Amino acid sequence: MTTASSSASQLQQRLPEEKPWPQLSGSNADAQTFKCKYVTNHNSLGDGNFSVVKECMNIHTKDLYAMKLIKKQTVKNKIQLIQREFDLLRSISEKIRDMEKKNEHSLDIFEGHHHILQLFDYFETADNIVLITQLCQKGDLYEKIVENQCLDLETQVTSYCACLVSVLEFLHSQGIVHRDLKAENVLFRLRVNENEKNLQGEHHGDFKYDLLAHDLVLADFGLAAEYNTSKVNSLKEFVGTISYIAPEIVKCKGVGEMTPDQVGKLDKYGCPVDIWALGVLTYFMAFGYTPFDCTTDDETLECISKCDYYVDEQMMHDPKYEQFWNFVQCCFTIDPAVRRSAKNLKQHPFIKDYFATSNSLNTKDTPNFSFHPTIRRVSSTASMHTLRSPSKSRKTTTLAYLNMDGGSSETSTAFSSKMDLPDLYVDRTINSRERSLNRIRDTLKKTLSMTSLKPAGTFDYLHANKNGTSLSSSKSGLVKKNSTFVLDPKPPKNSLMNGCFSTTPESRSNFNTPKTLSRQGSSTSVKKYVNEVDLLLTPRTASMSSNDTTAINDYDTTNDKNPARKHAASFQVNVDDSDGDETMQI
């Protein structure tokens, strides 16, 4: 026994340690390498300083996806952010798959785990880190709001808000804080593969709402963090989008210049920051402008700290908006310990109809939403609120990366385009929104953002137990009404890259006749598969909206009606640059 145990111990010592993905090696001699199993369209869906997103086809399954190629050369000091995003997406995808396998469903209209961007595959090349995700429509929630000036309160704002509440409830139940919930990160599913369903055209319940709410997908987990497993200081970072950040994040401003003792005195924030951002987004959907934005970033941050947001006098006294104002008040609570949770908000009168089943099972825990006082103004040094849609355009931004464990920091500067739009300045004494909107002047100030399945998914309403979960198997032919979520069975391993190193990173195809490949090096990758590619596919356009100022999700989309405009802002983030340049082949 001793000899055997000793031999096993020696063998274990000789075995190479499993290296975390990505390897970040140009040669990667120790890792198994494969030729790329995807072909991409010639045109990119969007590109930016750090990454390019393209539509791609898996040459084995012929399904269409979005391929995000993150440039190693530009993210070398931020690789841990990409690793964090990848780890979270993979963990969430596995959890979703497990829930669908166990048929864990409720009878509510929205299931939170059905509305999160799905990660399908991932791999590394000499130049890029590549993520394969689901394909989404061109145009995000931001563009939808701006094109329509605002959304309909009763059919769109309530349903979109309810869907996002279900998403946050799921994420928070898994201990995950998103930290960058905003309109640009809310996408719409694009159903392009054979097994994906179309809306049935029927409403669930006895009230009408926009069925596109079933297509909502929350994306960009570049800033997301696990509340219970993150480093002690990772949730003391000044990160996010200025228009959407909560007061507890504002307190972290300048954390990069703080001493370890000062950092230690900061309170760790958590899931309530997403609830605050939800309030901002709900307000933005209803009015077409954000509640706290002022002339300068400092004024905006002061208004956030004091919960001083613009309230239109006419809208405030409109009975139609009564529950809306109460809902955003629940979100705009300065003390995060008192701020409502996503689970509580499901029972709020503003959106409770979308969760009638689960709410009926939790009547004893129904919170009281009637205690809030009348909305009041808070005096601050900011004399003007800026009524505007938060701009998607970008400006020169200084990014400070903070190594909070080591007490050191470094800064770098990212340059991007600038687009000017009119500002809407509103004096606090004006009583009419319409009068305020006539006072257009100056230039839109920029705000910051840091960043960036198939058969199954069935649910039997007829065999649900008293807890609202299904007792039937996934073989039932019934599906959740109007839900457009589908979960792929695990694809065959030979059709995936699964984190390997690819010798041919990008095989391009025009997805059409004739069969053309953009470069000779790529043609060798798909030579034996090229006859399998469906040459009848026509080019499609889609987009995964995100931001161009980070190493995670950075690209733009434009259309004729609304040129793409991205957020911009200054931020500090905890990054351990332990990999070093020597591990990267640039």
Swiss-Prot record:
Residues 1-26, 503-524 are annotated as: Disordered. GO terms for biological process: cellular response to oxidative stress; signal transduction. GO terms for cellular component: cytoplasm; nucleus. CDD domains: STKc_CAMK. One of its GO terms (molecular function) is calcium/calmodulin-dependent protein kinase activity. The modification Phosphothreonine is found at T504, T538. The modification Phosphoserine is found at S509, S518, S578. It comes from the Eukaryota. Keywords: ATP-binding, Cytoplasm, Kinase, Nucleotide-binding, Nucleus, Phosphoprotein, Serine/threonine-protein kinase, Transferase. Disruption phenotype: Leads to cell death when overexpressing the camptothecin mimetic TOP1-T(722)A mutant. It catalyses: L-seryl-[protein] + ATP = O-phospho-L-seryl-[protein] + ADP + H(+); L-threonyl-[protein] + ATP = O-phospho-L-threonyl-[protein] + ADP + H(+). Residues 39-351 form the Protein kinase domain. The active site is at D180 (proton acceptor). Its EC number is 2.7.11.1. ATP binds at L45, G46, D47, G48, N49, F50, S51, V52, V53, K68. It is found in: Cytoplasm; Nucleus. Belongs to the protein kinase superfamily. Ser/Thr protein kinase family. Serine/threonine protein kinase shown to have protein phosphorylation activity in vitro. Present with 10200 molecules/cell in log phase SD medium. Interacts with RIM11. PANTHER family: SERINE/THREONINE-PROTEIN KINASE (PTHR24347). This is Serine/threonine-protein kinase TDA1.
